[in-house]
Amino acid sequence: MSKTLVAYFSASDTTKAVAEKIAEEEKADIFAIVPEKPYTKEDLNWKDKQARSTVEMADPNCHPAMAEKTPDLRAYKTIILGFPIWWGREPSIVDTFLTSADFAGKIIIPFCTSGGSGMGRTCERIQNIVGKDAKVMEGRRVGGEVSMEDLKLWFDGFQEWN
């Protein structure tokens, strides 16, 4: 078992592709954060105020159920966490993952995929969810075509996890 877990949520496979690239390069274990009820195209229509994703993101207490239980995190030192940016932050299903386990003593390295939006205050939000006993590193927005070389340069900046 690797000391690193790449956990990701991907609605359109963009984040999945980046997560798989990272897991392969870092020889990390991988876990897909999958909602119990998959999102449809209609659920993801951000222009529709009644769309499932819009309703979920408007409710700070919304924690959609996950299809699988979070893996036992005790053996992992580092969690590389990937997700798309929705409404300027991590999707509610990622919050479900973050509240489903104890992240004390873990290093969390977030990355997001987005057509243009950056991380904003997402890292602060994640830190507030997991608590002060976990260390959330500065996140980064990446495109679907990001090179592993670029990711390695970013990762190498985090001395604690190497």
Language-model region placement:
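N-terminal beta1-alpha1-beta2 submodule of the flavodoxin-like/Rossmannoid cofactor-binding fold
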Residues: 1-81, 88-90, 95, 99, ...
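Short, surface-exposed, polar/charged, turn-prone segments marking secondary-structure boundaries
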Residues: 33-37, 57-62, 107-110, 125, ...
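Short beta->alpha junction loops/turns
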Residues: 11-12, 84-86, 115-116, 144
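Short, glycine-/small-residue-rich phosphate/pyrophosphate-handling segment
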Residues: 109-146
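Short glycine/serine/threonine-biased micro-segments
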Residues: 80, 103, 114
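Conserved helix-turn-beta segment immediately C-terminal to the redox Cys motif
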Residues: 100-106
